[in-house]
UniProtKB/Swiss-Prot annotation:
Pfam families: BRCT (PF00533), DNA_ligase_aden (PF01653), DNA_ligase_OB (PF03120), DNA_ligase_ZBD (PF03119), HHH_2 (PF12826), HHH_5 (PF14520), Nlig-Ia (PF22745). The gene is ligA. InterPro entries: BRCT_dom, BRCT_dom_sf, DisA/LigA_HHH, DNA_ligase, DNA_ligase_AS, DNA_ligase_CS, DNAligase_adenylation, DNAligase_N. It is an enzyme of class 6 (ligase). Residues 619-709 form the BRCT domain. It catalyses: NAD(+) + (deoxyribonucleotide)n-3'-hydroxyl + 5'-phospho-(deoxyribonucleotide)m = (deoxyribonucleotide)n+m + AMP + beta-nicotinamide D-nucleotide. The lineage of its organism: Bacteria, Pseudomonadati, Aquificota, Aquificia, Aquificales. Its cofactor is Mn(2+); Mg(2+). DNA ligase that catalyzes the formation of phosphodiester linkages between 5'-phosphoryl and 3'-hydroxyl groups in double-stranded DNA using NAD as a coenzyme and as the energy source for the reaction. It is essential for DNA replication and repair of damaged DNA. GO terms for cellular component: cytosol. NAD(+) binds at residues 60-64, 109-110, 140, 163, 201, 320, 344. It comes from Aquifex aeolicus (strain VF5). Zn(2+) binds at residues 438, 441, 456, 461. This is DNA ligase.
Amino acid sequence: MFTPEREKELQEKTRELLRKIKDVKVLSFEEAKKLAEDLREVIRYHDYKYYVEANPVIPDYDYDRLFRALKEIEKKYPELITPDSPTQRVASEISGEFPTVKHYTPMLSLDNAYSEDELREFDRRVRQITGLEVVEYAVEPKLDGAGIALVYENDLFVRGATRGDGEYGEDITNNLKTIKTIPLKAEFSRFGIKLAEIRGEVVIRKDEFQKLNKERMEEGLPPFANPRNAAAGSIRQKDPKEVAKRNLEAIVYHLSYVEPPETEPPTHYESLKMLHTLGFKTLFKDTKVCKGIDEVIEYCKEWEKKRDSYPYEIDGMVVKVNDRRLWKVLGYTSHHPRWAIAYKFKPRRAVTKLVDVVFQVGRTGTITPVGKLEPVELGGVTVSSVSLFNEDFIREKDIRIGDWVVVERAGDVIPYVVEVLKEKRTGEEKPVEFPKYCPSCGSELVKLPEEVAIRCINISCPAQSVLRIKHWASRDAMDIRGLGDATIKLLFNRGLAKDVGDLYYLKLTDILKLPGFGEKSAMNLLKAIEESKNRPLDRVLYGLGIRYVGQTTAKKIAEIINSVWDLKDIPLEKLMRLEGIGYKVARSIKEFFNIPQNLEVLKKLEKAGVNLAKKVKEKVADVLKGKTFVFTGTLDCCSREKAGEIVEMLGGKFSNSVTSKTDYLVVGKDPGATKLSKAKKYGVKTITEEEFVNMIKDYVDLEKIKKEDKKEKPKIGRLF
């Protein structure tokens, strides 16, 4: 739609406008008219980049500044409002790649508030229209994902669509069916509902996002800028199998339409409760009903402080009038409902200087440029370096050493450069020169035709070797406790562990020579290494670090082979018959086994007694024998009842109350104060759900249990 030259013009115009729009209220009519035309032009461009391409080129905060400036101009001079103004309609995200469907009710945007004063002004308008002295609001986190509309008819999921232009969305039903948190059946009929349309967001957890970007960079693919882009780009994949690989989740937040109409719940909070009870993932437990605007503001401030600890990226809070009957009284504009507003958190951005660019070598040889910054505080964290991803990213943004840059940090996501302040250039800035040789081993670097990254292909590259050992020892692979980064580097630099096979030939005297190790810690490390010999086959496959082979792929491969050695001779076609394994992955596996050094490492592992074959499981009933478990709070892996069944299946005891005989209290989300207090009183060890899962994951199929647990009918109490 936009040529590269036109994009460059519009991006430059955006920068100019952001400098101009400090106070639009003092503009004359002619000045306002010209500025409004320019604002509409750049806003349409940024709508296209955000909604259609899922590749925004400016931060949300800057977009909102442009949009608010246009609204202020049109408020001062209503005669400047045009029918096609972005303020009069929802931005379109229709790409033309999927069939379109009409929403049952318009899927509008939300108006934004950036301060307490603006929230109070919203409350004043609501009270004025409704005639109420105090309004009850439902306040919930604002997820930063990709909007979807789900339709259920006669209890069955029949359609899923993107937001589109608000009236029509793109039909992505098959893609959404791969997302496990979307029930294919939900018993709305229990509430007399024959047809329901639900609104939600497709999101990706922050830890999954980090993992996804790491894999993409190792594969030579461009990383996603943020979790929202990852979610939006993923649901538009043409192959549902590709969507299924992304570990997406759908969280629903709104019941938008029901038939027959009289089955509609009276409040927003009650509708969330119903959806939660029917098996949808919702924001029900994070939603608070507030009496009046003061409580709303207090709750928003509370969440702004703890936003980083939330597993999903959130950029604010949504404030809705709780009584759904008042929604009709308050009505809508063509852009947003008048009964809701989004309170946006302050952006975590800062301006600093890029003082240098260094190059790091990844586990699979990918060369990543890292920008060194003059230290700057972002959201309570001091940032001194930033990933520059790859050569294309640097060229696209025209990043130079010595530039002043705008850096943004979103949650746990690695800080990144959102803009170069070219107007601050002095002429002394230097272009970034990419190396021709590996900074670790000196080998000539290569760039494969299908990749954006440059890569070192030397199997003996020191930097890659250290990272391969680190990956092997990681929690999801061989889980060697006590073998941290610093220890791995020391072992490698002293020639004690040049590859993962060498770990299993270490002696006590070797480890005692390392700084920081006494006899006890050295013995503990040797014990952890010894214990890792018995990990299941899929974790061994994942730990080998074969390019493109993640945890899911490793599990699928482990199901069709008896030993790692089977992969040496397995036909390419047989591998490609596995779901989710195409030619690229299969070829990478075959290439791994064609490298003599890799075969030598496998022989070392086998000789040391590392399990390279399907594990004959020990009698699982003995694993938790003699241990009593109590659970508190909500678990992600399964219900507390199901967790208790697992404990008993593995030989342990399950109890509902904490006593002096309890061994472990497993703490989930929103734990009960009584159980925590008793655990402290009796000296009972408290562990997280993650620690509990690590105890049992080698002996039970948690994915299967989770699915079976969801199929069980929930107990439905009185909701309305």
